[in-house]
Amino acid sequence: MPRSLKKGPFVDEHLLNKVDAQNEKGTKQVIKTWSRRSTILPDFIGHTFAVHDGRKHVPVFIDDSMVGHKLGEFAPTKTFKGHVKDDMKGRR
């Protein structure tokens, strides 16, 4: 069930303050964050966020197709190493 429209999108206040400060200065430094739950707003376009995946910070460059999604969607937490080969040779 999606979030109610009357509430608006959720963004951590400290993250929004950092983006606004960089927009005023005109800088585009990497913003390190642990806030995977924050929604990407149109103000974030062109910025790079270092989103924590539980082990390290993954750089995520924001473009217009990402608006409305969560930051955590672009920093996977699990590494997929592939399926085990289903081979009868290994069972002998």
From Swiss-Prot:
Pfam families from the UniProt entry: Ribosomal_S19
Family to which this protein belongs: Belongs to the universal ribosomal protein uS19 family.
Organism superkingdom: Bacteria
InterPro entries in the cross-refs: Ribosomal_uS19, Ribosomal_uS19_bac-type, Ribosomal_uS19_CS, Ribosomal_uS19_SF
Record keyword Flavoprotein present: no
Protein name: Small ribosomal subunit protein uS19
Gene Ontology terms, MF aspect: rRNA binding; structural constituent of ribosome
GO CC annotations on file: cytoplasm; small ribosomal subunit
Keywords, alphabetical: Ribonucleoprotein, Ribosomal protein, RNA-binding, rRNA-binding
Biological function: Protein S19 forms a complex with S13 that binds strongly to the 16S ribosomal RNA.
Species annotation: Corynebacterium urealyticum (strain ATCC 43042 / DSM 7109)
Residue intervals passing through the bilayer: none
Gene Ontology biological process terms from the UniProt entry: ribosomal small subunit assembly; translation
